[in-house]
Amino acid sequence: MSATAAQTAVLSGPKSVVERGSEDYPERLLRCGSPPDRLYVIGNVEVLRMPSLSVVGARKATPYGRGCARRFSTLAAARGLAIVSGGARGCDSEAHRAAIAEGAATVAFLGGGCDRIYPAENAALFQSIIDGGGAVVSERDWTFPPVPYAFRARNRLIASLSAATLIVEAGLPSGTFSTADEALAAGSEVLAVPGSITSASSRGANRLISQGAEPIIDDDTFLDALFSIYGCLRQETYPGKGAGNGALASSQAADPLVAALRAEPLGMEKLRDIAQECAPAGEDPWVWLMLRLAKLEQEGEVQRYPDGRFGPVVRPLV
């Protein structure tokens, strides 16, 4: 990698230097092995303290890897998570673009300084990240060159900032393994998308799964993982889905049961208490509750989560 391949560019946006110990410094970065003394940021510093998912993968990505990066980043972004990645070619770029398309914030951690754009062809992408309420970040001074060792070092920041890291595609050998190791060291979850056993581009991800990474085999397993790690994420209305198509819409906001389920997932004990207060006179509260939950489930507006609680449906993309 040649430092001359980096573009000395000017990204437009507010510049900040976030010192360790300041209120803007993300607490999660203190979990990494060597927290940086300061972060150089162009864009919105507040995004660094948002709930986020880190998405990483191969630079020389296959169509499968690019598609997985887009799909799962879109699903996560639609549920209120910022998307964190490394701004590299391939899977990283797809993850950033998916977040931007969803109207969500995204963070790009660069290996070099924020005024030494690498790769140069991603200058427009980095500007879009900033314009969309995200941030371009480095632990290096503004004009520090993008030398190889700095990229491996920045992987610990990508892995530590989020509660989970998703590996969408990785071969062997792969720098993605250092990101996975850093995530585990920081107490973050590691998720991985399996690929064909005959694909060299998936050998790394498959190896991570064999070593204990959580396999993401479809939308449902991904959404279950998000719920397990982040709790109840917000319900979204996708294009083509009318805002009034659900019993959890505003037309029923006055219903105490619906309002309670919108606020947080609830177990049967709390639901039974609500039923005692809300069931019409003369009706058995337990029977009334079971009928209401069954109706809401049938209409696709409430679901039972893996831990047995009920809450709003987390909708997959269609």
Please annotate each region the language model reported.
Residues 5-318:
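Glycine-biased, small-residue-rich flexible motifs in mid-sequence functional cores and linkers
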